[in-house]
């Protein structure tokens, strides 16, 4: 199984960062794992220009590292979104990277399950997993809201959220559950 982890931790070497790296190392025992450190990539952010649909179909017109993220996502069986919670939600690094996944869809709209969604650009989309670090001032409701939002994002990206874990579980447990979920 091909696994891509988008690490949205802005601080290298933090406790959450170390946990994500350990989960990746454990997952490598059984799977092909690519760990992308979002803090080290050039991401210019989505401006909503829709150039990725019109001018350069399937690729952001800004020519940043979002193309790397899109290729990695579409080429994976499992896309793991990792972020500590900050003020009750994932980091801006992860949100910005997710916003720049829009080129992997067509601009055309279809009705699915009574809802409007973009048409798929590719035949294969990865399942989505979520690794979260609890906000020191946060609570269970923050985790629930964040998980529901990313589940919705997964649905909009022709996928589904198959797994969610909070830092504190052992990396071995999480790696095992990631493999079982996909």
Where are the model-predicted features located?
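N-terminal beta1-alpha1-beta2 submodule of the flavodoxin-like/Rossmannoid cofactor-binding fold
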Residues: 1-81, 87-106, 169-182
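Hydrophobic beta-strand segments of well-ordered beta-sheets in folded domains
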Residues: 1-4, 79, 124-131, 160-163
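Small-side-chain structural scaffolding
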Residues: 76, 82-83, 92, 129, ...
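Short, glycine-/small-residue-rich phosphate/pyrophosphate-handling segment
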Residues: 106-156
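Glycine-rich phosphate/pyrophosphate-binding loop and the adjoining helix
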Residues: 137-182
């Amino acid at each position: 199984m091909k696994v891509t982890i988008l690490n949205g931790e802005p601080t290298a070497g933090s406790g959450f960062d170390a946990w994500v790296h350990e989960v990746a190392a454990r997952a490598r025992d059984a799977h092909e794992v690519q760990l992308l450190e979002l803090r080290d990539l050039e991401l210019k952010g989505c401006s909503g220009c829709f150039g990725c649909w019109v001018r350069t179909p399937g690729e952001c017109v800004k020519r940043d590292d979002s193309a790397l993220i899109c290729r990695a996502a579409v080429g994976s069986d499992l896309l793991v979104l990792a972020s500590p919670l900050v003020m009750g939600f994932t980091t801006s690094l992860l949100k910005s990277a997710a916003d720049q996944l829009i080129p992997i869809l067509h601009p055309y709209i279809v009705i699915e399950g009574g809802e409007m969604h973009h048409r798929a650009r590719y035949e294969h989309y990865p399942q989505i997993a979520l690794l979260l670090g609890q906000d020191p001032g946060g609570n269970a409701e923050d985790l629930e809201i964040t998980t529901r939002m990313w589940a919705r994002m997964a649905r909009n990206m022709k996928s589904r959220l198959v797994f969610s874990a909070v830092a504190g579980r052992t990396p071995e447990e999480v790696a095992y559950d990631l493999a079982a979920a996909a």
